[in-house]
């Protein structure tokens, strides 16, 4: 076999971060570690023009809006690093704050990094280098 099932990681940014959190909270321990950068965690916190184009309103599609990482926080399996820029105007930092609170209430361990005054791209100065090093070091530690 070419894949060590005990050393599988997943990571994503923005909607990829949403997919990472959903995949790690599916109830099966497929991923040993994951990183979510600037993830939407509840569609009610996202841009209504974009969200309602695909999902309609929360009243019209309550089941669709209920399918989100916050609702599944108690099922999180694997080590998690979540990162977000405090000035993100695309995926509001409230997404990560609310998800982190759900993890705390579910008694789940996780790590989080916030980047002050950084937008959705988390760049500028040494910021992107720091972020990528944090992601690499997290996987090196968790997937050894």
Protein language model regions, located:
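Active-site-proximal cap/loop segments of hydrolase catalytic domains
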Residues: 1-144
């Amino acid at each position: 076999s070419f894949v060590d099932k005990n050393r599988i990681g997943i990571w994503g940014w923005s909607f990829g971060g949403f997919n990472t959190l959903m995949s790690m909270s599916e109830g099966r321990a497929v991923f040993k570690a994951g990183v979510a950068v600037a993830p939407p965690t509840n569609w009610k916190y996202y841009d209504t023009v974009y969200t309602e184009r695909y999902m309609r309103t929360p009243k019209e599609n309550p089941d669709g809006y209920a399918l989100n990482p916050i609702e599944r926080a108690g099922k999180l399996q694997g080590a998690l690093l979540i990162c977000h820029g405090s000035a993100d105007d695309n995926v509001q930092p409230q997404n990560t704050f609310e998800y982190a609170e759900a993890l705390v209430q579910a008694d789940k361990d996780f790590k989080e990094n916030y980047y002050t005054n950084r937008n959705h791209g988390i760049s500028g100065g040494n910021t992107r280098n720091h972020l990528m090093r944090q992601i690499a070091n997290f996987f090196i530690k968790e997937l050894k």
